Amino acid sequence: MIVLRKTARDRRRLAAARSWQILISAASGVAATLFRALADENVNVDMIEQNVSSEGHTDISFTVPRTDVTKAAHCMEKIVVDTEASGFRTDEQIGRVSLVGAGMKTHPGIAAKMFETMATEGVNIEMISTSTIRISCVVAETDVERAVRALHAAFQLED
């Protein structure tokens, strides 16, 4: 069985609106408010990551196509005011590296090997998203090609 088919890279279309902190405890409905505002502006949201801190703040990070950054920033400015959030920041110097293959869910250790390979190469992972056939990592745009080459070597994939 082939565990991995390929790596994928995406440098040109991503930007991230990151570290959006809500200063409201029990922030029920905040994600709905945020993503409704983005949807109403036709902003296509890709990877989403949410964490709740021990202090009760919510931190939501997500990626959008670079073409949607201005619209997303406008939405975020309004959301910050409406929800009394602590603010937000964007990072347009990111890319996504993914491992793709049908055997992901049945072969333990794929994620560990991916993350170890990237760590050995000095590639810092900023976000992680998984599905049954894909592991995707957001990394600095300058690290994308190096990460892809290292993953190809580690998993013995063809170019």
Give a label for each model feature.
Residues M1-D159:
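A conserved regulatory-domain signal marking ACT and ACT-like small-molecule sensing domains
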